[in-house]
Amino acid sequence: MLKIVCRSLLLLPTFAFAADLPEMVIGEVSTKPGISLIFEGAIKDDVQPSQAFGLESESDIHIEVVATWNEAAPRGAVVGGFVPYLDITAVIKNQDSAEEIVVRLDPHLNMSDNFHYARNTKLPGAKDGVYTVTFSVRGPEAADVGIHYDWREEVGEKLFDGGIFKFTDLDFLDIAESRRR
């Protein structure tokens, strides 16, 4: 028992530190069929393989979408469970210079969000600029996931209709200047 208590005490500073890290909730949306989308700007991180997910040393932020089933989800879906097979991109636009980049968000796994869609990226302009981020979230193509008869009868021919979600006047400076470790 003493070993467990000692190990737990060693982890407390890690949890306290993680709780103090800034994270920016850009917006939240609930959409059919019972999917919650949380759009976030987070501190860049070491994600492997880094060539595929963005080098921490060459990035300003970690742009992400947490996609989970909510209480309105079809039967069989686990509330809070990850919604797989989404195709998500983010267009990050500097409102002053009109410079923009398109970033594809792919599945990631960490200890705080579990599975989520994200990418480390450089901002298209100064860290202290004002930005618009437009997220495009689409369900999988018909050939990418099988849809059983019961889903087709109760929900429809596809997982998710998708949508475009635009957020303006975003200030990423605190996130861009922060470090995880």
Regions found by a protein language model. Name each.
Residues 137-151:
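Short acidic/polar inter-strand loop motif in beta-rich domains
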Residues 111-120:
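Aromatic sugar-binding surface patches on proteins
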Residues 14-19:
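Sec/Tat signal peptide C-region and signal peptidase I cleavage site
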Residues 126-136:
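A short tyrosine-centered beta-strand micro-motif
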